[in-house]
Regions:
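Long, amphipathic alpha-helical surface segments
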Residues: 2-16, 23-26, 30-43, 80-84, ...
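Residue-level detector of buried hydrophobic side-chain packing
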Residues: 28, 56, 110-111, 166
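Active-site-proximal beta-strand/loop segments in catalytic clefts of secreted hydrolases
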Residues: 31-32, 58-59, 113-115
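Substrate-binding/active-site groove segments that recognize
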Residues: 45-71
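Alpha-helical segment that forms one wall of the substrate-binding/catalytic cleft
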Residues: 66-99, 104-122, 133
Length: 190
């Protein structure tokens, strides 16, 4: 089992990385499994479908400050440390593109979404445009639906579940990450 992500965050960290919360970390970890376990707490690098970049753990492109090679391996502790660094970086990048105040649930959902699709896709997606323009709940659900319903080549059902969890978290007013609730999304919209 990988290390717990619940670390004490200072007030300075909360201000510096507003989207990086325990909730966002939990949301990503709940739906992302570290890939290519070698056993005994070691993990190997891998390539995602259609990519030329090597990754490790939760999708990190680097380990210990350098880009990965095909022969790289890492321990649980190294993967966890790099995952936290990646999320801090993503938090800063997401903060640059979101111009409206958001609840902690919404921040968590957006960080998970951006981490999954990549910052280049996130900054140009229509969903971000709707969020920044204070669009209605129905408009957001309608825009999130293709991300839920699309057949993901490398993610399959796990990716569909992750997108639903992100939407549920984004729409949830509570402090807990909600369990899945069905939305009126057409299954084969795209």
């Amino acid at each position: 089992m990988l290390l717990s992500h619940k670390k004490v965050r200072t007030r300075e960290d909360k201000l510096k990385y507003p989207f990086f919360t325990e909730k966002s970390t939990e949301l990503i970890k709940r739906s992302t499994v570290p890939r290519t376990s070698l056993g005994m707490g070691r993990y190997a690098s891998y390539k995602d479908y259609g990519e030329s970049i090597w990754r490790i753990g939760y999708g990190s492109k680097q380990i210990s400050g350098r880009y990965l090679l095909s022969t790289d391996k890492a321990t649980e502790e190294e993967i966890e440390k790099q995952f936290i660094e990646d999320l801090k970086e993503f938090s800063n990048l997401v903060k640059e593109y979101v111009f409206v105040p958001l609840s902690s649930n919404r921040k968590a959902a957006l960080l998970s979404f951006a981490h999954s699709i990549g910052i280049q896709s996130f900054k140009t997606c229509r969903l971000l445009e709707l969020i920044n323009s204070h669009s209605s709940k129905n408009a957001l659900i309608k825009e999130w639906s293709p991300y839920i319903n699309r057949i993901w080549q490398s993610g399959g059902d796990l990716m569909v579940t992750k997108r639903r969890m992100e939407l549920d978290t984004y729409l949830s007013p509570s402090k807990e990450i909600p369990t899945f609730t069905p939305h009126r999304c057409r299954r084969n919209a795209y």
